[in-house]
Amino acid sequence: ELTELAGISRGTFYFHYADIYALMEQMESVQLARLESLMDNLIPNISREDVPPALTALFSYMNDNPEVCHAFYGKNWESDFTRNAKELIARRCLGQLQANGGGTQRQQYLLAFAVNGCFGSIVAWQDAGCQPPPEEMAAITWQAIRAVKVLL
């Protein structure tokens, strides 16, 4: 039972949350807000060659908190949370493209490729025991993002 694992009474849990789904919803909201903040740091730096510290921090967080990642992203990273995260990333990137006069169907397909590719790379990385280290994985991911950006 969750309350036993957390070391709290059922009364304390239900004082704060209606049920376990309310807890998950709140935790997902916090993670999506973190992702939104990450996008705030990544999008303005898309033309820079150096890996943004926020991307390295994301991989370090996933490396240090694998249980949290598996809880949110589910088996094979195909959960409601994952879909929401992908939509958030795509919406933010598409918004940037449209602000610069873009947003064509071709760009939308390239963006879908990039977003799904990033998530696929993360799955492969976690399946490989989070090797290479977070810093190197962030650099690989950044290189892939920038390669697609050239095509946009």
What are these regions (language model features)?
Residues 4-7, 14-40, 44, 56-59:
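An amphipathic alpha-helix adjacent to DNA-recognition modules
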Residues 48-94:
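Helical hydrophobic small-molecule/effector-binding pocket
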Residues 29-41, 52-60, 83-90, 110-114, ...:
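A short, Lys/Arg-enriched amphipathic alpha-helix from helix-turn-helix/homeodomain DNA-binding modules
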Residues 76-101, 105-116, 146, 150:
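Amphipathic alpha-helical packing segments from all-alpha helical-bundle domains
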Residues 38-42, 46, 69-72, 97, ...:
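Secondary-structure edge/capping motif, primarily at the C-terminal ends of alpha-helices
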Residues 27, 31, 35, 39, ...:
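Hydrophobic recognition helices of helix-based DNA-binding modules
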Residues 105-127, 132-147:
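Hydrophobic alpha-helical segments that form the core
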Residues 1:
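Short alpha-helical DNA-recognition segment
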